[in-house]
Structures are given as C-alpha cells and as structure tokens.
From Swiss-Prot:
GO terms for biological process: cell adhesion; establishment of endothelial intestinal barrier; intestinal absorption; regulation of membrane permeability. Residues 29-126, 134-227 form the Ig-like V-type domain. Glycans are attached at residue 184. Disulfide bonds join 49-108, 152-211. Keywords: Cell junction, Cell membrane, Disulfide bond, Glycoprotein, Host cell receptor for virus entry, Host-virus interaction, Immunoglobulin domain, Membrane, Phosphoprotein, Receptor, Repeat, Signal, Tight junction, Transmembrane, Transmembrane helix. Seems to play a role in epithelial tight junction formation. Appears early in primordial forms of cell junctions and recruits PARD3. The association of the PARD6-PARD3 complex may prevent the interaction of PARD3 with JAM1, thereby preventing tight junction assembly. Plays a role in regulating monocyte transmigration involved in integrity of epithelial barrier. Ligand for integrin alpha-L/beta-2 involved in memory T-cell and neutrophil transmigration. Involved in platelet activation. (Microbial infection) Acts as a functional receptor for murine norovirus. Residues 29-237 are extracellular. The gene is F11R. This is Junctional adhesion molecule A. It comes from the Eukaryota. The modification Phosphoserine is found at residues 280, 286. The keyword Disulfide bond applies.
Amino acid sequence: MGTEARAGRRQLLVFTSVVLSSLALGRGAVYTSEPDVRVPEDKPAKLSCSYSGFSNPRVEWKFAHGDITSLVCYKNKITASYADRVTFSHSGITFHSVTRKDTGTYTCMVSDDGGNTYGEVSVQLTVLVPPSKPTVHIPSSATIGSRAVLTCSEKDGSPPSEYYWFKDGVRMPLEPKGNRAFSNSSYSLNEKTGELVFDPVSAWDTGEYTCEAQNGYGMPMRSEAVRMEAAELNVGGIVAAVLVTLILLGFLILGIWFAYRRGYFDRTKKGTSSKKVIYSQPAARSEGEFRQTSSFLV
C-alpha cells in the first residue's frame, strides 16, 4: 500500500507542476490521469484527458500505430469510423469494446477557437490478447560445422510475445557457455524475434526442440516438438557420386569413339551429299531444225 501511495503522490506532483508551468507561460494545461491503459480484448476502455486554461476548448483525438494514423474525434465529436463504438466526454473518450487493432498511441489535442492556446497529451492503449500456438521451422538435419537457423513465431499475442526454446524438455539459457548442461553448444537466442541460431552446429545439438510463446497475459503456448539430427558431412557419398559421374562420362566418350571408328559419321555425311539427276522430255521440233532439248542436271 505504501508503494501505491508514493506513486499517487508522484502523479499528483507531476500534474501540479504541469498546471503551474502552463499557467506561468500563459498556455492551457492538458493532462491524463492514466497514460498507460491495458485492457483485455472485448472489454471497455476509458482514455482520460483533462484540461484547463482554455476559453472555448476544441478537443481532437488522434490514433497512431506504426504507419497507420486516423482521427478519432474532431471538434468535440467522434468521427464516423468510430461513432458506433466510441463516446466523447470532456474528460476523455470511452471505447465500448476494444479489439486488438485498437492497440496504439492516442493523442488528445486541445486548443481554443482563436488558436492562441494549445496543449496535448498522449495515452498508450494496449489491448491484452493471449498468445496462440507458435509456429516453428526446424531443420530435420544439420551438418556438423555448418550454420543452422531455427525460427518461432505467433501472430495473436498482444503485447507481442517473447519466445523461449527448450531442448529435450529443458529450457535453453541465453548464454550457453555459462550453463554446464549447454556448455558444449554454440548458439545465439533472440527472445524478441524467436530466432535460435547454431553457429557452428555440433554433435551435441541433436535433440527434440520446442518453442514457448508468452506475453504475460493468458497461458503460455508451446509448439510441437521437432527433432533435429546433427550429422557429419557425407564425404563418402559425395566421392561415390563423383565416381559414378566420371564413369558415365567415360562410357559416353567411348561410345562416340566406337561410332567414329565404325564409320557411322562418314556414312551420314555421304548420304547427305548424294547427287540428283533430273531428266526432261524433248520438246517437238520443226523440220530442218535441230536443237538439243534433253538436259541432265547434276
């Protein structure tokens, strides 16, 4: 209880200092009683915004999340895209039922009609959604000495989930060298992205791997277990493949040489250069006239 009381006193001091400094500078004061709001999905949410020092205040609310920006309230009225689920009051805006898409930063902007006085404050809304079952990509085999990447992700958790890896049911530490059970392995683990990288892969890395997603809300979710085998490079198989390729190439060269010795290529050449003879019938000729009309074309 003492901690809550101290936090309340700090909040009151901040509010008082904001109001006094704004009045001293001749500006309006805009503040919120709860700058960080966390609400489960499908529940109502109140975003507070209070102000003072405005003769005729005009209130607007803006929403921003990543590249998305939209206007929730304009000139003290909720915009059409939010009208069916948000209400406006002079103390803030209220969502009747929030969805995960409502997560983001809401800025309350207050000005007077003349535009001489202006102030704003931001409220972070986080819609709480438990994580779903994560999807993993784990190679079934990895060559010892190479680099292997295992990934884990899920799309529903809000706030975003953190990811923890397990090998044969034992949670993998961030620093393998500091743990006796994992000191023979060399890997890096990113709990934010869910990526597990072995570099290089060792024989000890053979085992069943699972990934767990958790975000502090709802139950943690685990993936299916997938086994990864760490194996030596199959040098014998590579050598055998090279030998088979060389033998086949040798048979091909021998076949071409045999066909050449048998004269198959010469016969083909002679067949394509054989002569053609065309005979034409002699035309009728008049008496006393002799003309050669038969011709041979070679």
